[in-house]
Amino acid sequence: MIARILIPVVVFTLLPYLWIYKRYGKLRLKSLWQRVLFWLPAFVVIAYSAYITILPNFLPRNPVLIDIWFVMMAVCAVPQFVFSLFSLFGWCCMRLLHGHRNWGKLLGLVVGAVAFFCFIYGFTEGFPKMQVKRITIYVPNLPKSFEGYRIVQFSDIHLGSYYGWRGHLPQRDIDSINAEKPDLICFTGDLQNVTPDELPEYQALLSSLKARDGVMSVLGNHDYTYYMDVDDEQEIAALEKRMRNFQRSCGWRLLMNEHVTVHRGADSIYVAGTENYDKPKRTNVRKALYGIRLGSFVLMLQHMPKQWRETWPSTINKEKDEDGDVIGPDRKDSLVVAPQLTLSGHTHAGQVSVLGLRPSMFTPYDYGLFEEEGCQLYTTSGLGGTVPIRIGATAEIVVITLKRK
């Protein structure tokens, strides 16, 4: 992860120190040891970041190393960057307006301090925080027997991020899900951070999830080997098989471009699920929907919300035949059913949200409930993350009640 942003980290760290040294420190730091102490935090951050980049895989196996990196950034880089931005802006205004005081410097001190405390809060208090969100979704073709059907969705738990003082959080989350006594539990991907080695200690806990119609799941981008430093095809296949077998050993119904039927007496609905949409791309929507009659209610599980567009009626039915009332995986001209409700995760709601502004807002359908062409999508903020920080984008489990429109 750090390897992909090493150059921005170096720039983000060094430039503020250069500005502060040039504007405020050059005349005050007269001795060599004073200058060394001034520059030491910046070079420690850069050296540590470089060290992490040479470790194999997307993330180091020991998550404590990432925690140390975030603390170092919070102390040695973020406040300095914020202060420098305001100081530079104030200096430019002072020069343009021929003023005598740089008010940006004072404002930068305040905002830099706020940024520091927000960073620490998000790391220590914001990340563990969790809410139970309840929504009611109305659909036109829900069978009578499924009126009031309750689904609990959880996503992006990233079990490799829980250890030490965070170790109790998965138990809390699973207990909260079971307390809802749902009809169906849906997991929408990213069980691990990097490797299946993170999972065995949680098998008993995940197996304890209980719902009348069981637990159904799909794989997220982290549930493959994309973030591992592995090239051997046999090893890749073995690692991905371990992930699939682990979920099945927990009693979950893993949906790999396929669907299952849920019955209530003579009525039924379908739950479909696709593999990952991007990096790696394994998805096959038409295969997942094969055999579903038109007019049926379909709940679709997809890890990435940007794939939702592929399930809209205008997209999925670009070509139609005269009597194609059954979906075919290979017949591109067959008439296909558009899932009325899709559940996704992946975005974590940006993990930082301030006044409704969040990094993921430029990603389509990044958080919340959306409706297009009679189809609805709910994208959850998820429960965890590879980056152990949340500010304003609270982790959640989602309780969905289905009602007939």
PLM feature segments, named:
Residues 145-405:
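Soluble catalytic domains of enzymes that build or remodel membrane lipids, polysaccharides, and related
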